[in-house]
Design a protein with these regions (language model features):
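An extended, acidic
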Residues: 1-114
Length: 114
């Protein structure tokens, strides 16, 4: 994860607990960038970045990005490792290995899925 590039819409995502979860991962990433919204998922699918972390999403915010990322071989889950299609807290990763590193960091801040 220390070589990962992480994107998010903005650093103060969702609630205070969401922000703390984001920081738990961001503090381990090589590079963190903000402000690209759904374009981050396109960058992930294209192999340009490694990780996207968001919170407070609606179903319509994430369903199309899930299709794009998964078609490119990436993974999209909620912060508990379950389905993300209803929105809420979402993590998208380029690989299963990276997801396996990220989920334990997010777990203390994960809320029940929608």
């Amino acid at each position: 994860m220390d070589q990962a590039t992480l994107f998010s819409t903005y650093p103060e995502i969702g609630t205070k607990k969401d922000y703390q979860g984001f920081r738990a991962v961001a503090d381990h990433a090589n590079l963190v960038r903000y402000g690209v919204d759904c374009y981050a998922y396109a960058l992930l699918a294209a192999g340009q970045i490694d990780l996207v972390i968001e919170a407070g999403l609606n179903a319509y915010d994430i369903q199309a990005p899930i299709a794009v990322v998964e078609a490119a071989g990436g993974l999209v889950t909620n912060w508990q490792g379950g389905p993300a299609h209803l929105g809420g807290q979402v993590v998208a990763c380029a690989s299963q290995d990276l997801l396996n590193e990220v989920l334990p960091l997010l777990a203390p801040y994960a809320v029940a899925a929608k």
